[in-house]
Amino acid sequence: MRIGIKKKPVGRIIYELTAVFALDSAGGGMVVNSLIALWLAQRFDFTLGRIGLVLGLMSLASAASALLSPMLSARFGMVETMALTHAPANVLLIAAAFAPNPQLAVLCLAGRSLLSQLDVPPRVAFVMSLVQPEERSATAAFTNLPRSIATASTPWLGGWLLTKSSFGWPLVIGGSLKLVYDAMLWIRFRKFSTRA
């Protein structure tokens, strides 16, 4: 691996993780806040004020997860925390698309926000645990660049889908991609998991 990872098996694991992380990010690009705002306006006729309130609630729920993540990682392991908290978040994201009323949709989105970021601290810690200290900066850059590109590559599709229908197709497709990420992460990487 050219980023400076000395152990070849670890280099391969980093490549695989990077690809799996990019899949998750592609799903995330389908449900950026601007597209969720557009969907809420189209589907439930939310005003800008209500949309702002919902997005604020989602952000607060997401911030709360930062406090829970280290405790879960220490108890269950990093990969377990990543996959097993992220999967229910994505089920809630998909469920929001099918919500028959705005209250249930907002409840699903808030629940999703509470769970969806629990994977971030253990993801970073897990990747860093695989490499030598002097390799961490390069590894972080290597794993984050494809994630950023993947996130940037899918909002257009979410927007296009919303021009065709007020149904939450971006939520369903984005959530489904993220569920595939969760399954791949669990199947392929749980044997490497450690407690943080």
Language-model segments: which ranges?
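Structural signature of the two symmetry-related core transmembrane helices
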Residues: E80-A95, G175
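Helix-loop junctions at membrane interfaces in 12-TM secondary transporters
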Residues: A97-L109
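Helix-to-loop junctions at the C-terminal end of transmembrane segments
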Residues: S65-M78, L162-T163
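Intracellular juxtamembrane helix-capping segments at the cytosolic ends
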Residues: L118-V131
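Loop-to-transmembrane helix entry/capping segments in MFS-fold secondary transporters
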Residues: L48-G49, P133-T143
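Short amphipathic helix-loop junctions that connect adjacent transmembrane helices
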Residues: S34-I51
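Transmembrane alpha-helix termini and helix-breaking/packing motifs in multi-pass membrane transporters
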Residues: L38, Q42-R43, S153-V172
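Juxtamembrane intracellular "pre-TM" segments in multi-pass secondary transporters
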Residues: M1-S25, Q42
